């Protein structure tokens, strides 16, 4: 049975973990589908959905380059679902600042009508885990793993906030674009990847 073709942008970050989560989501859903790592424009053009994993957002933006970012932007604006995780959320945003250095000037996709603050909870040593609820996604409980995580400081009227922590926005959805501050691939819970798979079906 055929199903959606999901790509994980493999320039940086937890690529294998996200691929594993999508494999689990496909298996649990009992549907067809495939997942692969992608890093060039021609491969992205063939996808039904794209995951942009965590890492260093300024590096990802630089490595991606103009053509790759343009193809992602065109595909997503044409309706392809995208899922940005941590640095991937930053890349999808329309504006980013850093807690320490202010404006970053990094390349952004401007696909989510949000502004974000990088490293909002502090650096690596301030990493933490906490329980979240995403009832609008059908997920009552989810373990959020926050590692040098951003927060969403502004969200436009078309953006649905799907999770908050300490009165801070940490997960949003705008149409077919999903963005989270935390790392769902570092848990044993594929619920959020299953939700994204449904978006791509």
Curated annotation (Swiss-Prot):
Binding residues annotated for L-glutamine, in chain numbering: 55-57, 118, 147-148
Alphabetical keyword list: Glutamine amidotransferase, Hydrolase, Lyase, Pyridoxal phosphate
Pathway where it operates: Cofactor biosynthesis; pyridoxal 5'-phosphate biosynthesis
Signal peptide location: none
Pfam families, per database record: SNO
One Gene Ontology cellular component annotation held by this UniProt entry: cytosol
Active site: 86 (nucleophile), 183 (charge relay system), 185 (charge relay system)
Molecular functions per Gene Ontology: glutaminase activity; pyridoxal 5'-phosphate synthase (glutamine hydrolysing) activity
InterPro entries attached to this UniProt entry: Class_I_gatase-like, PdxT/SNO, PdxT/SNO_CS
Reactions catalysed: aldehydo-D-ribose 5-phosphate + D-glyceraldehyde 3-phosphate + L-glutamine = pyridoxal 5'-phosphate + L-glutamate + phosphate + 3 H2O + H(+); L-glutamine + H2O = L-glutamate + NH4(+)
EC number: 4.3.3.6, 3.5.1.2
Listed GO biological process terms: glutamine catabolic process; pyridoxal phosphate biosynthetic process; pyridoxine metabolic process
PANTHER family: PYRIDOXAL 5'-PHOSPHATE SYNTHASE SUBUNIT SNO, PYRIDOXAL 5'-PHOSPHATE SYNTHASE SUBUNIT SNO1-RELATED
Function: Catalyzes the hydrolysis of glutamine to glutamate and ammonia as part of the biosynthesis of pyridoxal 5'-phosphate. The resulting ammonia molecule is channeled to the active site of PdxS.
UniProt similarity note: Belongs to the glutaminase PdxT/SNO family.
HAMAP family, sorted: PdxT
Quaternary structure note: In the presence of PdxS, forms a dodecamer of heterodimers. Only shows activity in the heterodimer.
Name assigned to this protein: Pyridoxal 5'-phosphate synthase subunit PdxT
Species for this entry: Cenarchaeum symbiosum (strain A)
């Amino acid at each position: 049975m055929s199903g959606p073709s999901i790509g994980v942008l493999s320039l940086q970050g937890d690529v294998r973990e996200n691929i594993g989560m999508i494999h689990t989501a496909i298996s649990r859903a009992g549907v067809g589908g495939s997942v692969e790592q992608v890093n060039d424009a021609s491969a992205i053009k063939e996808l039904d959905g794209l995951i942009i994993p965590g890492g260093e957002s300024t590096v990802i933006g630089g490595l991606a380059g103009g053509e790759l970012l343009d193809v992602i932007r065109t595909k997503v604006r044409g309706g392809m679902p995208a899922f940005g995780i941590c640095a991937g959320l930053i890349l999808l945003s329309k504006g980013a600042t850093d807690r320490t250095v202010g404006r970053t000037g990094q390349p952004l996709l401007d696909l989510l009508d949000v502004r974000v603050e990088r490293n909002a909870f502090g650096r690596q040593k301030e990493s933490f885990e906490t329980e979240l609820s995403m009832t609008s996604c059908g997920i009552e409980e989810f373990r959020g793993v926050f590692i040098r995580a951003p927060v969403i400081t502004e969200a436009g009227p078309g953006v649905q906030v799907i999770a908050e922590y300490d009165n801070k926005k940490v997960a949003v959805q705008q149409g077919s674009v999903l963005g989270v501050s935390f790392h769902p691939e570092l848990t044993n819970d594929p619920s959020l990847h299953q939700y994204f798979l449904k978006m791509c079906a």
